[in-house]
Design a protein with these regions (language model features):
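Short coil-to-helix segment of the ABC ATPase nucleotide-binding domain corresponding to the Q-loop/switch region
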Residues: 92-99
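The feature captures the beta-strand-to-loop junction immediately N-terminal to the Walker
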Residues: 40-42
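Conserved ABC ATPase "signature" region
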Residues: 99, 110-128
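Hydrophobic anchor residue at the start of the ABC signature
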Residues: 146
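Conserved ABC transporter NBD signature motif
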Residues: 63-74
Length: 163
């Protein structure tokens, strides 16, 4: 079973004025495979901090987070990320951006192209593979980011303010 487990996560920041800010305080949860967790709250309440810890962009002050019974301590293809602004490489084509998600694996070039084409069709971008990403609308760019995330069939999908 794929579980995401947070145990006593704490994140403390120091402001430029030297003040202490507790962005996360003793956060505990278990998310089972197939479940969806939506974190809601006002600006500055720690939503993105929790996401950044889960994606291992930052380390918590204390506590741990586990996926499939393994502590998350570095990047891995078992997690997929869709950023608020897509975070696409504008100088690459749509297909090259989607393929970027597969670069962490050793894949046959023919199989890779087949997978990219399949995902472009799934997200409604069939025929756009050779289009530079910067020429797409915001919604189309979001679909490219989604295809890039899902092409590896991650166990966990992280989305920061999806549209």
């Amino acid at each position: 079973m794929s579980d995401l487990v947070s145990q006593n996560l704490n994140m403390i920041f120091k402001t430029p004025k030297g003040e202490t800010v507790h962005a996360l305080k003793d956060v505990n949860f278990t998310l089972k495979k197939g479940e969806l967790l939506t974190v809601l709250g006002p600006s500055g309440c720690g939503k993105t901090t929790l996401l950044n810890i889960t994606a291992v962009f930052i380390r918590p002050t204390s506590g741990s987070i586990f996926l499939n019974n393994n502590e998350i301590d570095g990047p891995g293809v078992e997690r997929g990320m869709v950023f608020q602004q897509g975070a696409l490489f504008e100088w690459l084509t749509v297909a090259e951006n989607v393929n970027f998600g597969l670069r962490m694996k050793n894949n046959d070039p023919v199989e890779t192209q087949k997978k990219v084409d399949e995902w472009l069709e799934i997200v409604g971008l069939k025929g756009f593979g050779n289009t530079p990403t910067y020429q797409l609308s915001g919604g189309m760019q979001q679909r490219v980011a989604l295809a890039r995330c899902l092409i590896n069939y991650p166990d966990l999908i992280l989305m920061d303010e999806p549209l």
